[in-house]
Each structure stands twice: as C-alpha cells, then as structure tokens.
UniProtKB/Swiss-Prot annotation:
Belongs to the universal ribosomal protein uL3 family. It comes from the Bacteria. Keywords: Ribonucleoprotein, Ribosomal protein, RNA-binding, rRNA-binding. It holds the Pfam family Ribosomal_L3. Part of the 50S ribosomal subunit. Forms a cluster with proteins L14 and L19. Transmembrane segments: none annotated. This is Large ribosomal subunit protein uL3. The keyword RNA-binding applies.
Amino acid sequence: MKGILGRKVEMTQVFTANGKLVPVTVVEVQPNTILQVKTLETNGYVATQLGVFDKRENLVNKPELGQFKKANSVPKRFVKEIRNMEGFEVGSVISASDIFETGQYVDVTGISKGKGFAGAIKRHNYSRGPMAHGSGYHRGIGSMGAIINRIFKSKKMAGHMGHVKRTVQNLEVIAIDNNIMLVKGSIPGPNKGFVTIKANVKGLSNTQAAELLVRNAPVATEAPIEAPVVEEVVSTEE
C-alpha cells in the first residue's frame, strides 16, 4: 500500500487524448516528507508517517517540534500515517510521480463538508408530506416507530450532518505534473481541504474495466501489400 498527502484546489474539466471531456478535481500534492517509519518489531505494525505543507515553529508544541527535528524537517501542517507503507527512510522526500502514474486508480479520503444541524429530509432523503394548506405536516419526520414508549437506536432523525471522514474509491488519475494531480470525478471536502490519496484496494467496476481494456487495446495496423513476384521465362527456341 502506497499513498501521499495533498490538498484539494478546485474542480474543472479537461479533454483526454481521445477527445472525451471529463470532470476532474485538481489536487495540490507538494513533496511529502517522511517523518517516521513504524515497523512490526518496534511498533507492532507497519506504517509510514508523512507530512506536507510547512508551518511556523511557534504554532507547534515542544514534543511535536522534537519529532520534526528528528526527521530534519520543518513543522508540517498536515501529518498522517499510512498503514502497510514501507521501503522509505526518515527524512526523505517523495512526490506524486514517485508513487502514482497516469491511468492508475486511487482512493481519496477527506473530511466532507459540514452542513450543521439538518432535518430528516435533507439528511436522510426522506419524502416530504403534502404541501396543501389542510395537511398536518409538511417537512416533519412522521412516524418514528410502532412502540410508543421508546425509539430504537440508530433511528434516522434530524441531527448534525457532514464533517465526517469519507472515502471515494476507484478514481482515475488523469495527469500528474508540477506537483499537481488531476483525479477524475469529485473528492470529499471543500476547496483547500486536506486529502489522503492511496492506491485502490478494491477491483474496478465493469464500466471502468471496460474503459481500461479499450484504452490499453493494441492499435491494429494494416500490413503493406507486397507486389507478387513474376518470374521471367527465358525462351529456348531459336
């Protein structure tokens, strides 16, 4: 498992090599610094801690500053470890092109946009009631169960919506250039939100597999037609 940290910039659209217009998310992936390498013998599991985007020293406490100095690095704003990522040394720097390549599929994890306190219709896609003047309710939750003295746990009701960790899987990498990565489709979070990009863990859907098969199919070329060889007949008659 390999991954890298970045920051969402915006969404736009680009044309592919075959002329297809696809929506993409622009992700800023500055070089990541390896802050710590965890091994099975020392920590009980394998992981690599990454850091990206510099931060002033007066914004970190002494224990955090000591950890950054061990890696010969300045303080970082976004620090996260990725499990089962090994083969790197503390203090080294990696870029997006070292981890991924164009055409590869990745999983992107981020914090979704917060919506605040939302009703059941917005939060759980409930149907609203009749909107006529004689109806008893319009956007109410309605019945909450058949037992009158209690409400079951996990009942879908109004409450806090958004601002949770979400992962979008199997997104295609359209391009990587100059610390910028273009990922097909949308990713969680607002603009300038931090995201974690890792190699995909699940297989592709039928549509994605078909597109990949068509894109990697060899181009058929016609072989040149050779002219037939005409043997010269020598006459022996005088």
